[in-house]
């Protein structure tokens, strides 16, 4: 079974392998540049367009959203390309842990693994479908405007983008963007969610194994061996979460700033525009940002919650039936489980639902302050 056959990450890794973002070969390495460079050029032209739209605040904010979203997608993709070896090594570690559970005699653990695979696969399909439809909506929205406009505003010095045939050529060039941007934007979100779901599943399996320790039918040595196995497994899970945090800590910190600023700006834009089409578009964009943020923080929060259940399971092990060696080892293990197992934003703040709420509160606070200053 290859990494693409593991449902937790298979869809996303398969796309990235095809595009040579991960696991490139000498014959396919050019694909990542053919994938990323046109979008990079489009993002630069969006920036030029933003400079021209400085005086029109609603149009500026809307195009700033598109610029930031595509810049964020590029940032994620370049991160994976630059850290390709680290991502490939981490996925190799995931495959090893996955197969160790799949090949074990623990039927309950295999059931947890199958449910985790199904959940991650369904989430990846949902994310790609929603992103594709979202961008299709942005693609057709200019058709309902009175003036000529492109789905993603672009500009070049000395070129009129609204005169024929430049307008038609640019519009046709943007037709592949639903597929292109969906494959660039959502795989990272789905991969993060799949990796976090696997971390949660491993902790659930550990809780179950701890619950199997004890009982009159188990000898002292058997109990100790089961406990030692759980400690070794917990150490593996800790290493897995630590390496996941090392890979994503900085990117999620940058995204927290970008998403918070975008939500604040879109709320302000919603307060000053009158076009029903633009209102619907902005509400859709805000919901998209909230969904991506919630996916990040909810999945990371589940690891924290499950780690707390591990500590409870250790505490509930019937230590009073065992000898001194078992009790001392269990006490040390209990102290180890008190160490927080979490993904941190910029290695500073834990990714929890409380942090998600704090980001929303900060965005809304800046929005009300901006509205008060402008009197809108």
Swiss-Prot record:
**Cytoplasmic side, ranges:** 1-32, 80-123, 200-247, 298-342
Q: Which InterPro entries match?
A: 7tm6_olfct_rcpt (IPR004117)
Give the CC-aspect GO terms: dendrite membrane; membrane; plasma membrane
**What does the annotation say about its assembly with partners?**
Interacts with Orco. Complexes exist early in the endomembrane system in olfactory sensory neurons (OSNs), coupling these complexes to the conserved ciliary trafficking pathway.
Give the matching PANTHER family: ODORANT RECEPTOR, ODORANT RECEPTOR 30A-RELATED
BP GO terms, sorted: detection of chemical stimulus involved in sensory perception of smell; sensory perception of smell; signal transduction
Q: For this UniProt entry, which segments traverse the membrane?
A: 33-53, 59-79, 124-144, 179-199, 248-268, 277-297, 343-363
Record's family? Belongs to the insect chemoreceptor superfamily. Heteromeric odorant receptor channel (TC 1.A.69) family. Or30a subfamily.
Pfam families per the record? 7tm_6
- What function does this protein fulfil? Odorant receptor which mediates acceptance or avoidance behavior, depending on its substrates. The odorant receptor repertoire encodes a large collection of odor stimuli that vary widely in identity, intensity, and duration. Complexes with Orco to form odorant-sensing units, providing sensitive and prolonged odorant signaling and calcium permeability. They are necessary and sufficient to promote functional reconstitution of odor-evoked signaling in sensory neurons that normally respond only to carbon dioxide.
Q: Where in the cell is it found?
A: Cell membrane
Ordered alphabetically, the record's keywords are: Cell membrane, Membrane, Olfaction, Receptor, Sensory transduction, Transducer, Transmembrane, Transmembrane helix
Describe its membrane topology.
Multi-pass membrane protein
- Entry protein name: Odorant receptor 43a
The tissues in which it is expressed are: Expressed with Orco in 20 sensory neurons on the distal edge of the antenna.
Q: What is its main location?
A: membrane
Q: Name one GO molecular function term.
A: odorant binding
| Other comment | The atypical heteromeric and topological design of the odorant receptors appears to be an insect-specific solution for odor recognition, making the OR/Orco complex an attractive target for the development of highly selective insect repellents to disrupt olfactory-mediated host-seeking behaviors of insect disease vectors. Odor-evoked OR currents are independent of known G-protein-coupled second messenger pathways.
| Residues in compartment: Extracellular | 54-58, 145-178, 269-276, 364-376
Q: Does the keyword DNA-binding feature in the UniProt annotation?
A: no
